[in-house]
């Protein structure tokens, strides 16, 4: 769906039906504005980066669960508050914080990584153990980092976002909107270091002080995988995820002929982003 929306909204105008005109796509009610497709996801938004112009909006202010896209804020906040060469030592916070088969790189107690390695683990492998450890290091505690996340969201103009953890794992009190996630994703895509990490398809963490083997991380973001039906050659990277609670969520940036767009999809069916 994200591929369909980005840079293709005007093309699809002629295909729209009368049903779409009465849908929850607010941009379709703007006189003279290209009509966007009606999609199955509960909410979605496309925003032009430099002017923050809303190109497409469906329920963009509806409060929903953010899912794994939370890690975009986790990564951005870390880049803004640490050096890539800083060292991170795993404690029980990260090692014991992942339960129920959550995504991780199986980091071990007292294992040392650089911040750069941690951010690749978070963005490419969705590593919850590393996200928790980064949060403790940057914020003094996970709760302290979460407060920083919420403060930064307000600074970026978010009005309906509350973060409760740095991983995006389900929490009934954690919520956002498509519009707020677009603002957060814009700030991330505008960060050169974030883009470098997000658009990387593979990254190797060498042997550490504890682990004798390499960890080869493969980016699981479908829009960067040229063998996936969702592949989009102009994509600059992003995050996606799925849980039964949140449905499918996706945020990304794309650039074509000097135009930068931010796309957000929230609460789609499994595999539909």
Question: Residues of each region from the PLM?
Answer:
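Sec-dependent N-terminal signal peptides of Gram-positive bacterial secreted proteins and lipoproteins
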Residues: 1-12
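Domain-terminus/edge residues, biased toward the C-terminal soluble/receptor-binding domains
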Residues: 158-159, 170-273
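Active-site-adjacent loops and short helices of periplasmic peptidoglycan-processing enzymes
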Residues: 13-179, 183-192
């Amino acid at each position: 769906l994200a591929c369909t929306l980005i840079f293709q909204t005007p093309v699809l105008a002629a295909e729209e039906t009368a049903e779409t005109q009465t849908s929850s796509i607010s941009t379709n009610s703007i006189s003279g504005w290209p009509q966007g497709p009606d999609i199955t996801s509960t909410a979605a938004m496309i925003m032009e980066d430099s002017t923050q112009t809303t190109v497409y909006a469906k329920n963009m202010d509806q409060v929903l669960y953010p899912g794994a896209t939370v890690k975009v804020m986790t990564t951005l906040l870390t880049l803004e508050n640490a050096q890539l060469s800083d060292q991170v030592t795993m404690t029980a916070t990260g090692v014991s914080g992942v339960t129920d088969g959550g995504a991780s790189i199986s980091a071990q107690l007292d294992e040392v990584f650089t911040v750069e390695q941690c951010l690749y683990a978070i963005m490419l492998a969705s590593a919850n153990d590393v996200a928790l450890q980064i949060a403790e290091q940057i914020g003094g505690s996970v709760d302290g980092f979460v407060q920083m996340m919420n403060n930064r969201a307000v600074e970026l103009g978010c009005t309906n976002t509350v973060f409760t953890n740095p991983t995006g794992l389900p929490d009934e009190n954690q919520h956002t909107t498509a519009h707020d996630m677009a603002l957060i994703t814009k700030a991330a895509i505008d960060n050169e270091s974030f883009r470098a990490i997000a658009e990387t398809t593979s990254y190797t963490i060498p042997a550490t002080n504890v682990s004798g083997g390499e960890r080869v991380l493969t980016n699981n973001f479908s829009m960067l995988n040229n063998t996936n039906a969702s592949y989009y050659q102009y994509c600059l990277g992003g995050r996606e995820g799925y849980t039964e609670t949140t449905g499918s969520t996706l945020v990304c940036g794309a650039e074509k002929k000097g135009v930068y767009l931010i796309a957000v999809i929230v609460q789609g069916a499994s595999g539909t982003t």
